Design a protein with these regions (language model features):
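Short catalytic-loop micro-motif centered on adjacent basic/acidic residues
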Residues: 4-5, 73-76, 130, 178-181, ...
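Phosphate-binding site of ATP-dependent enzymes
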Residues: 159-240, 250-251, 255-257
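Active-site nucleotide/adenylate-binding loops and adjacent lid/helix of ATP-dependent enzymes
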Residues: 107-186, 196-199, 226-229
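Short, charged, surface-exposed secondary-structure boundary motifs
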Residues: 37-40, 58-60, 102, 107-113, ...
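ATP-dependent carboxylate activation and anion-phosphoryl transfer catalytic cores
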Residues: 69, 224-314
Length: 314
């Protein structure tokens, strides 16, 4: 099959491209930057430079690329692209282009930090962090320190730890921010996959030992923790996930708290593949093609590091 993959400069792209090509798929990669700016541009079977996701012609451009290259499906790799494609599902469906991503109902929750808290706060199986719209903050008492986040934020954008009252008062669009009690602790992230038809699910967890300022783990320790696996499974089943997502937790006072749900491949999806041998990308596609998923694979705890290689772009 010919598949269009967006944002091939993102951290998950090389794993996605490799997994698709290993199983015979033809990959058309797109990005806002020229092919020469990313090694992944050369890994793709074909590459097309496209406008920013917020360009009025973005979706029309994707549809035109699918027409020219005979792509039958799209795999978006970043949240903003998922948001704009989700808002324009009808035009992709009209052209019979499959979207290998979560449903609108799931995205409505997963891309909203307040709704995540509201959706799971009554469940004993998941520990959530109390979350309030900044515009409603005066009606609640939250013990300091606080953490300020964008309501629909990604990659730690807009995060302010323990903001002052004056800082809060300078924010004009308060409905676009949430505030939470700040929890100190270690970050754990879970790559999770679920087949909606059969109910089969599987996950690989890792502790992020070194994490960039935008929330990407570059040195991690893979672990198996039944508590994390059970929480991820509960979240996936309650949301009725189909395909692969990433779930972030923070361990505070010996408890795991749900931080975020990323409705896409994590930037560290290659860590899970290298550790377990389980191909989340291939099996994600199978969830949308009525194919049987790979069975569960046991994996060992190990420390993995992200490495980089300098190459010429010419």
């Amino acid at each position: 099959m010919r598949i269009l993959v967006t944002a091939i400069g993102s951290m998950s792209a090389s794993r996605v491209i490799s997994s698709l090509q290993m199983t015979g798929h033809y990959v058309v990669g797109i990005d806002i930057y020229p092919k020469e700016y990313h090694e992944e541009g050369y890994l793709c079977n074909s590459f097309v430079q496209v406008p920013f996701f917020n360009d009025p012609n973005y979706c029309a451009t994707l549809i035109d690329i699918c027409r020219r290259y005979k792509c039958k499906a799209i795999i978006p790799l970043t949240d903003p692209e998922i948001d704009v494609i989700n808002a324009n599902r009808a035009i992709f469906e009209e052209k019979k282009i499959a979207l290998y991503m979560q449903s609108s109902e799931i995205l409505d929750i997963a891309r909203n930090k307040l709704k995540i808290h509201e959706f799971f706060k009554a469940d004993n199986e998941v520990n959530t962090i109390n979350t309030y719209l900044l515009s409603d903050f005066h009606t609640y008492y939250v013990k300091r320190p606080w953490i300020l986040k964008k309501l629909h934020g990604r990659s730690s954008e807009g995060v302010v730890i323990d903001p002052t009252i004056n800082q809060l008062l300078t924010i004009s669009n308060m409905d676009d921010y949430v505030i939470q009690p700040y929890l100190d602790g270690h970050i754990f992230t879970v790559d999770y996959i679920r087949d909606k038809k059969s109910g089969f699910d599987y996950s690989v967890a890792r502790e992020e030992l070194i994490r960039t300022s935008n929330g990407a783990g570059v040195t991690v320790k893979t672990i198996y923790d039944k508590t994390l696996a059970d929480m991820a499974s509960f979240i996936g089943n309650k949301l009725d996930i189909n395909g692969s997502i990433n779930i972030e937790f923070i361990k505070h006072d010996d408890k795991y708290y749900l931080m975020d749900i990323n409705p896409r491949f994590s930037g560290g999806i290659d860590f899970s593949y290298k550790c377990s041998g389980y191909d989340f990308v291939l099996n994600h596609c199978r969830c949308f093609c009525s194919d049987e998923l790979e069975p569960v694979r046991k994996y060992e705890s190990k420390i993995l590091i992200k490495s980089y290689e300098i190459k010429s772009g010419n």
